[in-house]
Amino acid sequence: MSCQIYPSQMCPGKAYKNCKLNIMNFWEVICIYYFALQGSFLGILVNLPILVTTLPLLPPALFFYLMYLFALPLKDIFNIFFPSLDPILIPILIFFLVGVSRARLSKVFKWR
């Protein structure tokens, strides 16, 4: 089975040949949905096993992708003051943002 999906501007350099997909990479999960759903019916049928397998991963993938987009400007600001932390800054910021959002939600909804 070969995937007939080609890269676009959204995911440059990501052609999925022989359906070798790292489902733990949220960017690739989002890309496979983007390509399959913008394509033809045949594109959806060819990638149906991948789409079904990654369906439970889609909400967390979208959540972490949005967190990543939100952390990019913060990373640029922190990079000015702490350039040595550049390789690990995005994971630190995402961890902090997720922790703060959970703390705020728990106060609003009284979760314990």
UniProtKB/Swiss-Prot annotation:
GO cellular component term of the entry, any: host cell membrane
Membrane association type: Multi-pass membrane protein
Keywords: Host membrane, Membrane, Transmembrane, Transmembrane helix
Membrane-spanning segments: 26-46, 50-70, 80-100
Source taxon at top rank: Viruses
Localisation per UniProt entry: Host membrane
Protein name as it appears in the record: Putative transmembrane protein ORF112
Species assigned in the record: Acidianus bottle-shaped virus (isolate Italy/Pozzuoli)
